[in-house]
């Protein structure tokens, strides 16, 4: 892997500068993103083996690059130039709320179209579950921690909005689940984070994993009770029902 290139040096490379305004390669937008990186305090962007900016991910809202800030590797999210809004302030607000609830990678800064968060160097949840290499008790502990994080979001009134597809939104590092990407999150009186994750775990693609871990599908009535009253008692009942808690 090539060494990181300073943000100042990126400005001198038209090929790299163009990557900052994916997919249009708009010079003005690239400079806006570059200035935002400097204001936040990002020192450098990592290059890949081809000598281009290292792309960690690409969604309909952002591209994600690997950067360096205060000497640490970070994830740099830059709004796509074709997205309806080039302002990352709303996502930063939702991410900050999640952090205060003890959920998500640390938000390190944002400015204009750029948002910088703690880098989470782990596989997505589906890959982690499918790859194996863990004891069933360890995996159940990981899933219970994920459920607890969803419960905290529910109690805090923040709905992630995309957890029914945890492949893209939950990473696992050393057995610890990390919920990422709060771009679709919203404040609502009836969040559905826990029920979304339980729906994902009940999907057909994870039938083998459920059998290995001894997990069960929750009853609709129990899900309905939790939605109406996401109390600790209802949470514990659900966890016992699906097999993540004993008793």
Predicted feature residues:
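Juxta-kinase regulatory segment immediately upstream of eukaryotic protein kinase catalytic domains
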Residues: 1-53, 238-246
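ATP-binding glycine-rich loop module of kinase domains
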Residues: 30, 36-90
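Conserved structural core of kinase catalytic domains
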Residues: 96, 103-144
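Protein kinase catalytic-loop region centered on the HRD/HxD motif
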Residues: 148-160
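Hydrophobic residue at the +6 position relative to the catalytic HRD Asp in the kinase catalytic loop
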Residues: 166-172
